[in-house]
Amino acid sequence: MIAVLLAVAAVLPWIIDEGPRWYYHIDFDVYRKGGEAFLAGDNLYTRDYEMLGINLPFTYPPLAAILFAPLAWIPFSIGALAMTLVTVAALWWCIVIVARHALPGRALTDHRVLATWILPVALVIEPVRETLSFGQVNVLLMAMVLVDTLTRRPWLPRGVFI
């Protein structure tokens, strides 16, 4: 049931906003190009990467290029779809973490159900909708910060993900 709701929630912003259409995830493509440049041994910062006639620089730290390198091995469309699905799942998990922190007396199941109901609304909010349309990592970074700061029993030392 949760999987079905997540799938519906993933497409809801497009249905509400502009109807079903696929966005070109321009930022995701820059991440891929940075990963490709790293794998090829190219300098990340001496050239721009052309995306739809727009020249964009790779503005992320070198570690990001290393982390983005696996994206160069998969087709753009599969990577963009995977990024969208991972972002939606991460957003759901962020809502669960915040709900657990804000409503500590409830069972974990209650937090997951609440997150499932909140997720479709969260997906149509402009910052989240644009994160999805550009293929950005914002929600993934937020998830890392929340896991690092609000998890009750962290499995890594605090501060690792920040």
What are these regions (language model features)?
Residues 1-111, 130:
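TM-lumen/periplasm interface segments of multi-pass membrane proteins
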Residues 2-6, 118-119, 141:
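Hydrophobic alpha-helical transmembrane segments of polytopic
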Residues 66-70, 127, 143-147:
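Alpha-helical transmembrane segments of multipass membrane proteins
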Residues 76-78, 110-115, 153-158:
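Membrane-helix interface segments
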Residues 114-123:
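Short helix- or helix-capping micro-motifs
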Residues 129-138:
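Short acidic/glycine- and proline-prone juxtamembrane loop motifs at membrane-interface regions
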Residues 139-157:
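Specific aromatic-rich, kink-prone transmembrane helix
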Residues 160-162:
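Transmembrane helices and adjacent periplasmic/lumenal helix-loop junctions
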